[in-house]
Amino acid sequence: MLDPNKLRNNYDFFKKKLLERNVNEQLLNQFIQTDKLMRKNLQQLELANQKQSLLAKQVAKQKDNKKLLAESKELKQKIENLNNAYKDSQNISQDLLLNFPNIAHESVPVGKNESANLELLKEGRKPVFDFKPLPHRELCEKLNLVAFDKATKISGTRFVAYTDKAAKLLRAITNLMIDLNKSKYQEWNLPVVINELSLRSTGQLPKFKDDVFKLENTRYYLSPTLEVQLINLHANEIFNEEDLPKYYTATGINFRQEAGSAGKQTKGTIRLHQFQKTELVKFCKPENAINELEAMVRDAEQILKALKLPFRRLLLCTGDMGFSAEKTYDLEVWMAASNEYREVSSCSSCGDFQARRAMIRYKDINNGKNSYVATLNGTALSIDRIFAAILENFQTKDGKILIPQALKKYLDFDTIK
């Protein structure tokens, strides 16, 4: 959440930055008008309370003064009305504020959509085939790796059931991801059923309510990303400054409606309602957030390098970043059959945006004051998509899949055929 005082006192700057994030200008104007009304109501309420306090002293001395008693009764009703008006305007102002995204860091390129993203680097050698490579969906079917029909029978479309060697390969990918980062990040195993407050704290609600699965007739949701659980481990807590930074990781199942995926690739294991990934999260002082982001994206890249998968790094523009992010890098892996890069990681610094919503602070060692921490999150990596990338990039002419060297220690086979 943005700091309402900064937004109010430096409106022109915030208006420019929020318009760069594709925020509707009408909503900004509505916030300013509601904020003015809220402060006016508060001022009138405070004056009425002061008057009531003075009047109460007079009534105490003149208990039989009917005029004073009538005036006191009338003032109490006025205070109640003013209090209701203040709360109403405060709630509207808060709701508007919760729908504003974070403002972009100064190093982020301005743009409306993904066409303005910047490609910063490419790593790895793309495979060269003397045959037409098959898409991972076809390889899954030919090699009996994923029982798409059985998953559809059990759950519906865009769910998958990995079989035998595919399940083992997925586990090997997961183990590699954890092992490469376990020396830096404390590992957690977390619940996937979460409450509404946790989703609000990280910025998934109210903005993306149509993309999360809500459990019917309950106050619970299925987690869309492990970022939610990891960030909320410290909701309403205060760190000692010397305990920062904190690095956490978790691997698990995530659930999304993918409401806006019409026209996007949904076949195979790329865009699923239920998917697996390893998540990285950091808590640090705000002035260190961008340097911590650079380190985090390198932590994600090392997995792609270990697997010898070609990839590129993108710096996302203002119009393509996630709601809570101030700066985001995407890592995209090469998909040999479709001849394109596909996202497997998104690493973001959120500044104090999430911490302000979740009330996560630290106590300054010098002055003893409490300040908001910065939070960072990154996927390292999407397990189902890495599975797809391995199939496409490590396939052979005779229909086999070669296992990347980095995964062989986790498996009792080195080819899938």
From Swiss-Prot:
It comes from the Bacteria. It catalyses: tRNA(Ser) + L-serine + ATP = L-seryl-tRNA(Ser) + AMP + diphosphate + H(+); tRNA(Sec) + L-serine + ATP = L-seryl-tRNA(Sec) + AMP + diphosphate + H(+). L-serine binds at T225, L226, E227, E279, T379. Pathway: Aminoacyl-tRNA biosynthesis; selenocysteinyl-tRNA(Sec) biosynthesis; L-seryl-tRNA(Sec) from L-serine and tRNA(Sec): step 1/1. It is found in: Cytoplasm. InterPro entries: aa-tRNA-synt_IIb (IPR002314), aa-tRNA-synth_II (IPR006195), aa-tRNA-synth_II/BPL/LPL (IPR045864), Ser-tRNA-ligase_type_1 (IPR002317), Ser-tRNA-synth_1_N (IPR015866), SerRS_1_N_sf (IPR042103), SerRS_core (IPR033729), tRNA-bd_arm (IPR010978). Its EC number is 6.1.1.11. ATP binds at R256, Q257, E258, E343, V344, S345, S346. Keywords: Aminoacyl-tRNA synthetase, ATP-binding, Cytoplasm, Ligase, Nucleotide-binding, Protein biosynthesis. It holds the Pfam family Seryl_tRNA_N. One of its GO terms (molecular function) is ATP binding. One of its GO terms (biological process) is seryl-tRNA aminoacylation. It is an enzyme of class 6 (ligase). Its main location: cytoplasm. GO terms for cellular component: cytoplasm. Belongs to the class-II aminoacyl-tRNA synthetase family. Type-1 seryl-tRNA synthetase subfamily. PANTHER family: SERINE--TRNA LIGASE, SERYL-TRNA SYNTHETASE. Catalyzes the attachment of serine to tRNA(Ser). Is also able to aminoacylate tRNA(Sec) with serine, to form the misacylated tRNA L-seryl-tRNA(Sec), which will be further converted into selenocysteinyl-tRNA(Sec). Homodimer. The tRNA molecule binds across the dimer. NCBIfam families: serS. This is Serine--tRNA ligase. It comes from Mycoplasma genitalium (strain ATCC 33530 / DSM 19775 / NCTC 10195 / G37) (Mycoplasmoides genitalium). The gene is serS.
